From Swiss-Prot:
Binding positions (FAD): 284-312
PANTHER family for this protein: ELECTRON TRANSFER FLAVOPROTEIN ALPHA, ELECTRON TRANSFER FLAVOPROTEIN SUBUNIT ALPHA, MITOCHONDRIAL
Keyword set includes Repeat: no
Subunit organization: Heterodimer of an alpha and a beta subunit.
Statement: the UniProt record of this protein carries the keyword Flavoprotein: yes
Any single GO CC term annotated in Swiss-Prot or TrEMBL for this entry: mitochondrial matrix
Note: Present with 2950 molecules/cell in log phase SD medium.
InterPro entries in the record: DHS-like_NAD/FAD-binding_dom, ETF_a/b_N, ETF_a/FixB, ETF_alpha_N, ETF_asu_C, ETF_asu_C_CS, Rossmann-like_a/b/a_fold
Organism, as annotated: Saccharomyces cerevisiae (strain ATCC 204508 / S288c) (Baker's yeast)
Official protein name in the record: Probable electron transfer flavoprotein subunit alpha, mitochondrial
Sequence similarity: Belongs to the ETF alpha-subunit/FixB family.
Compartment(s) where it occurs, according to its Swiss-Prot or TrEMBL record: Mitochondrion matrix
Free-text remark on how the cofactor is bound: Binds 1 FAD per dimer.
Name of the gene encoding the protein in the UniProt record: AIM45
Length: 344
């Protein structure tokens, strides 16, 4: 086919160069209401670093430039090379119908081998749409990145750990933020910021009506360092609040709940932890009156220290707990709250 080895080498060298150039990652960064970088996005960048590719981060919304500057001046991500910002207030709501055309345009216009989002409500809404338009099957809830094409994720409520080798030209990943520590603090003077305004129109007739925010001084559930969770055993809404709130106040903790608690009207469904709720991995997780259904364990078993309080010695929650207190939670929890308050 080739007349000489000299003819082969230049072509091989060029092919290698093109392949290396193509290995790059696009990461979607979310910001908080004040323009700071969301904690899940900091973990997302930590995961993206494990792909060992140059990283381009895209930031949208009216505070995109503020978020970009905060990321550049306050954190360190070794592979991050460029921040692409689309500063427009119409993107503040993060409607997937508006974000999807923009992200698809970026992916088609750049040589990206990977596109990563966090497992936030925005990420979970956007990536399936992007995948459909690119005809690529996303890999969801990635907890381990072994190499640029091999990923590990839990399935069947965490009972099976699946290893996936993705052969797609563009790999779309939803990263479980709780599985990766956030990037370290520092600064990135060499990172460039590119401002763009070429936002493609949304073909769908979708309008954001209003935002209803639940005001709370407690930490956000998915990023809290300590979580206190109540189960079905708490019986009613008043008991749920009366027992859990003082303990959560002492520990500066977020409050969570099982699906049974939510279904029984003990609390709002925004507190639900588990397979059909939120996934948390705090430093301390206290389960009060939680039996330990498989679906609930899927959302909290990666917690660093798990404390279970239950009067049933055979409750499944004790199988994953680091510390267990068997007894009447109506006596144990107030006493624990009082002693922790004195220690504080």
């Amino acid at each position: 086919m080739f007349k000489s080895l000299a003819a082969v080498l230049p072509r091989a060298s060029k092919a290698k160069f093109l392949q290396k150039n193509y290995a790059s990652t696009l990461a979607f960064i979310e910001s908080s209401k004040d323009g700071s970088v969301s904690r899940s996005s900091l973990s997302l960048l930590a995961a993206a670093q494990k792909l060992s590719n140059p990283i381009t981060a895209v930031i949208t919304g009216s505070k995109a430039e503020k978020t970009a500057e905060a990321l550049k001046s306050s954190y360190s991500c070794s592979n991050l090379e460029k921040l692409v910002i689309f500063e427009d207030s119409k993107l503040d709501t993060c409607l997937p119908e508006q974000l999807t055309p923009l992200l698809v345009k970026l992916l088609k216009g750049g040589d990206y081998s990977h596109f990563v989002v966090s497992n936030s409500s925005v990420g979970k809404s956007v990536l399936p749409r992007v995948g459909a338009l690119l005809d690529v099957q996303p890999v969801c809830e990635v907890t381990v990145i072994k190499d640029p094409k091999t990923f590990i994720r839990p399935i069947y409520a965490g009972n099976i750990i699946s290893t996936i080798e993705c052969q797609a030209e563009k790999k779309l990943l939803i990263i479980r933020a709780s599985a990766f520590p956030p990037i370290a603090e520092g600064s990135m003077d060499s990172v460039t910021i590119e401002k763009r305004t070429d936002i493609p129109p949304c073909d769908l007739n979708v309008t954001w009506v209003k935002t209803i925010l639940t005001k709370s001084e407690r930490p956000e559930l998915t990023s809290a360092q300590n979580v206190v969770t109540g189960g079905r055993a708490l019986k009613d809404k008043e008991t749920f609040e009366k027992l859990l709130s003082p303990l959560a106040d002492v520990l500066h903790a977020a409050i969570g709940a099982t699906r049974a608690s939510v279904d029984n009207g003990l609390c709002d469904n925004s507190l639900q932890i588990g397979q059909t709720g939120k996934v948390v991995a705090p430093n301390l997780y206290i389960a009060i009156g939680v039996s330990g259904a498989v679906q609930h364990l899927a959302g909290m078993k990666d917690s660093k220290v798990i404390v279970a309080i239950n009067n049933d010695p055979d409750a499944p929650i004790f199988n994953v707990a680091d510390y267990g207190l068997q007894g009447d939670l109506y006596k144990i929890v107030p006493e624990l709250t009082e002693k922790l308050g004195k220690y504080k």
